[in-house]
């Protein structure tokens, strides 16, 4: 009735190391799935999504369900995750890829033809604006602040209790 004898029955659904009990997220090994085709996530953008059954459902040592219940629930978890993902990608992948393509094309066009020319124009104009601003600051704002400071420096307050 041990867990080791039941592992052979569910070998179809799970890997051998799926039974290891650990307390952290176990990211998938890229070499493990190397023979299954081209790498669809070469920059590991979604490595955080590779969660196993033990990362979602965990039983403490003091309370364990029956081995068959644990194995069946593990198998159903993996199968439902696989089937629902495939089902959703059939209906959502193409429209969302189309929408993402339109969004990124629009953002790229805006960045290339509007934002970058505006930024470059601002960077070209800023040295002259900086010179004018420094002159205005030195001629108007600095003397004004100095005179206001001198005026307030002669103010003194005396409090008396009556």
From Swiss-Prot:
Bilayer topology: Peripheral membrane protein
GO molecular function: D1 dopamine receptor binding; protein heterodimerization activity; protein homodimerization activity; protein kinase binding; protein-macromolecule adaptor activity; scaffold protein binding
GO BP term (any one): negative regulation of transforming growth factor beta receptor signaling pathway
UniProt KW keywords: Cell membrane, Cytoplasm, Golgi apparatus, Membrane, Nucleus, Phosphoprotein
GO annotations of cellular component type: acrosomal membrane; caveola; caveolar macromolecular signaling complex; focal adhesion; Golgi membrane; nucleus; perinuclear region of cytoplasm; plasma membrane raft
Transmembrane segments: none
A Pfam match: Caveolin
InterPro entries noted in UniProt: Caveolin
PTM section of the record: Phosphorylated on serine and tyrosine residues. CAV1 promotes phosphorylation on Ser-23 which then targets the complex to the plasma membrane, lipid rafts and caveolae. Phosphorylation on Ser-36 appears to modulate mitosis in endothelial cells. Phosphorylation on both Tyr-19 and Tyr-27 is required for insulin-induced 'Ser-727' phosphorylation of STAT3 and its activation. Phosphorylation on Tyr-19 is required for insulin-induced phosphorylation of MAPK1 and DNA binding of STAT3. Tyrosine phosphorylation is induced by both EGF and insulin (By. similarity).
Residues where Phosphotyrosine is found: 19, 27
Localization, UniProt: Nucleus; Cytoplasm; Golgi apparatus membrane; Cell membrane
Main location, first listed in the record: nucleus
Cytoplasmic side: 1-86, 108-162
Intramembrane feature ranges: 87-107
Modified residues (Phosphoserine): 20, 23, 36
Function: May act as a scaffolding protein within caveolar membranes. Interacts directly with G-protein alpha subunits and can functionally regulate their activity. Acts as an accessory protein in conjunction with CAV1 in targeting to lipid rafts and driving caveolae formation. The Ser-36 phosphorylated form has a role in modulating mitosis in endothelial cells. Positive regulator of cellular mitogenesis of the MAPK signaling pathway. Required for the insulin-stimulated nuclear translocation and activation of MAPK1 and STAT3, and the subsequent regulation of cell cycle progression.
Protein family per UniProt: Belongs to the caveolin family.
Quaternary context: Monomer or homodimer. Interacts with CAV1; the interaction forms a stable heterooligomeric complex that is required for targeting to lipid rafts and for caveolae formation. Tyrosine phosphorylated forms do not form heterooligomers with the Tyr-19-phosphorylated form existing as a monomer or dimer, and the Tyr-27-form as a monomer only. Interacts (tyrosine phosphorylated form) with the SH2 domain-containing proteins, RASA1, NCK1 and SRC. Interacts (tyrosine phosphorylated form) with INSR, the interaction (Tyr-27-phosphorylated form) is increased on insulin stimulation.
Record-given protein name: Caveolin-2
The organism of origin for this protein: Loxodonta africana
Lineage: Eukaryota, Metazoa, Chordata, Craniata, Vertebrata
Name of the coding gene: CAV2
């Amino acid at each position: 009735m041990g867990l080791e004898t039941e592992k052979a029955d569910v070998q179809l659904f799970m890997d051998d190391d799926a039974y290891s009990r650990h307390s952290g997220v176990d990211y998938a090994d890229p070499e493990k799935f190397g023979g299954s085709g081209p790498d669809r996530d070469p920059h590991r953008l979604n490595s955080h999504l590779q969660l196993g059954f033990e990362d979602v459902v965990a039983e403490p040592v003091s309370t364990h369900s029956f081995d068959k219940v644990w194995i069946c629930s593990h198998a159903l978890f993996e199968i439902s995750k696989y089937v629902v993902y495939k089902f959703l990608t059939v209906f959502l992948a193409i429209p969302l890829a189309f929408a993402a393509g339109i969004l990124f094309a629009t953002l790229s066009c805006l960045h290339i033809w509007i934002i970058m020319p505006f930024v470059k124009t601002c960077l070209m104009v800023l040295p002259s604006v900086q010179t004018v601003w420094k002159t205005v600051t030195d001629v108007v704002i600095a003397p004004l602040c100095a005179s206001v400071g001198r005026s307030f420096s002669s103010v003194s307050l005396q409090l008396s209790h009556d």
